[in-house]
Amino acid sequence: MQFKIKKSFIISLFIAILSFQNNLYSGPTTLDIDDFGIISLMYHRFEENKYPSTNIKLKDFKEHLNIIRENNIRFVNPNNFEQNLKDNKNQRKVLLTIDDGFSSFYENAWPILKEKKIPFILFVSTREVGSNNYMTWDQIKELDKENFVEIGNHSHTHEYLVDESYEVIKNDIEKSISIFKNELGKNSKFFSYPFGEYSLKFKSLIQSLGFKYAFGQHSGVMDETKDLYELPRFPINEKYGEI
């Protein structure tokens, strides 16, 4: 099957993801010809066409998964994330992440990932769980039972916390941790900064609260040399998701 790669798709870095050994992307951050490691893709909504900046069409999502498989790129299981960071010699890997826990993910993408047992992290903001267009705790617990799924912490309010005081940020994250423990029996070791934005105080707080990894929204390949509290991810949406 031949794919006609659109310019927007190249810009989105998906081609770079599939071509660690070729500098096909010439944007703000290029991948070196010898780069190996983990690329993280970030998705949000599925088949919610009125939100093009955060939505992906299901047919495109399926094609992404197919391309990854056909190019012998490994899906990273978050349960083995630390080992995957260390063991990167001559290996190309992809970590799937889904932010916010929208109902459209559960209804459209989850059945596909479940059937094929494709690993991923689902980041949820605890205040929104159970509200309109968001997953419920029962649905989240269903996913949490699977050994290829990790439920990550995405704050409580999903507000823009970077400019807030240390106490405001601390109260928000501690609230989310408390709810995680009440609902899932544990907090996650993974954190996703709301809007991908963080500061030194924010990063320091996340580390002090026991998280092992935190993700932003910037270009880069992950390996053991990277700051574990500034891990990169590439957002994939309708604009940059078609092939």
What are these regions (language model features)?
Residues 123, 214-216:
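Short beta-strand and adjacent tight-turn residues that come in two discontinuous sequence segments
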Residues 99-100:
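Noncatalytic alpha-helical scaffolds and linker/capping helices
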Residues 36, 41-52, 85, 91-94, ...:
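Metal-dependent polysaccharide deacetylase catalytic core of the NodB/CE4 family, i.e.
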Residues 2-10:
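Bacterial N-terminal signal peptides that target proteins for export
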Residues 195, 217-219:
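Short secondary-structure boundary segments
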Residues 11-19:
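Bacterial N-terminal signal peptides
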Residues 20-94, 240-242:
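N-terminal pre-catalytic segment of deacetylase/amide-hydrolase enzymes
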